[in-house]
Amino acid sequence: MSDILRKIEAYKRDEIAAAKAHVPLAEIKARAKDADAPRGFLAALEAKRRSGRFALIAEIKKASPSKGLIRADFDPPALAQAYEKGGAACLSVLTDAPSFQGAPEFLTKARAAVALPALRKDFLFDPYQVYEARAWGADAILIIMASVDDALASALEATAFELGMDALIEVHDEAETQRALKLSSRLIGINNRNLRTFETSLETSERLATMVPADRLLVSESGIFTHDDCLRLQKKDIGTFLVGESLMRQEDVTAATRILLTGKALAEVV
C-alpha cells in the first residue's frame, strides 16, 4: 500500500468509528433496507454498450489531493442533469471529505435529480460503509484493491450484492488484476493513475486489458480527456470509461460530455 493510501486508511478508520458511534450498525442496516431500490449500475453500462455506444461513468468531484479545487461553481444536481443530458450512463460521486471535499448529500442530491444509477466513490475499509452507501442511495460501490486485502474485498463485495448493489473493482497493476478476477463482480476498473507519482497513462489500461476475460466489463479510469482517447481504448475492447476532472472543468458540461462520447457537440437524432 502506498503512503498516501495509508494516510487515507488512518483517517477513514477514525471516520468509521465515529459514524458507528453516531449511527449504530443495526440502524444503518435499517436505513439501507428502507432506501429506494437500486437502479442497476452494471445493467445501465451494458445497455449502452449493447446499443453500440460508449458507456460513461461521469464523475462529480469538487477537488482532489493532486489538483486541489477542480470546480468552484459546484452544484451536484445540476452537474448530474448536465451529464445525463450529455449521454452519460451512470454517475460517480465523491463522498470523501478530507481529500476530495466530498459529502454524502452530494451523492443523495445528484442521484435524486436524474434517472441514472450512482456509485459511491470513496475509500471503503468496512462493510458498514456499504450499508451507509445504500442508505444514501448509492447503486454501486468502489473496491480499491490497492487498499484492501482479499478477505476485506470479498466482504465488501458480498455486502454490496446482499443489498442488490454492484461493485466496481479497481486495479492498478497485474497483481491487483489477478486478485480482482478471483472476486465475483463482472465490473473491473483499471485506474490509469499511478498512486505513487499521480501521473496517468492509458498504457496501463491497454496492458492490463489483455489479462481480463471477455465476460467481465472493463472500465478505464483517469487520464481520459478526448474522443480520440476513447477510440484508442476501443482498440483494446474497452468501451466504458470513468471520467471526472476533464469534464468538471468545462463551462458547458453537457456539450463536453457529448464531444467526449461522440466527437460531436450536438446530440444525434435517433
UniProtKB/Swiss-Prot annotation:
Belongs to the TrpC family. It comes from the Bacteria. It catalyses: 1-(2-carboxyphenylamino)-1-deoxy-D-ribulose 5-phosphate + H(+) = (1S,2R)-1-C-(indol-3-yl)glycerol 3-phosphate + CO2 + H2O. One of its GO terms (biological process) is L-tryptophan biosynthetic process. It is an enzyme of class 4 (lyase). Pfam families: IGPS. This is Indole-3-glycerol phosphate synthase. Pathway: Amino-acid biosynthesis; L-tryptophan biosynthesis; L-tryptophan from chorismate: step 4/5. InterPro entries: Aldolase_TIM, Indole-3-glycerol_P_synth, Indole-3-glycerol_P_synth_dom, Indole-3-GlycerolPSynthase_CS, RibuloseP-bd_barrel. The keyword Amino-acid biosynthesis applies. Keywords: Amino-acid biosynthesis, Aromatic amino acid biosynthesis, Decarboxylase, Lyase, Tryptophan biosynthesis. Its EC number is 4.1.1.48. It comes from Mesorhizobium japonicum (strain LMG 29417 / CECT 9101 / MAFF 303099) (Mesorhizobium loti (strain MAFF 303099)). The keyword Amino-acid biosynthesis applies. GO terms for molecular function: indole-3-glycerol-phosphate synthase activity; phosphoribosylanthranilate isomerase activity.
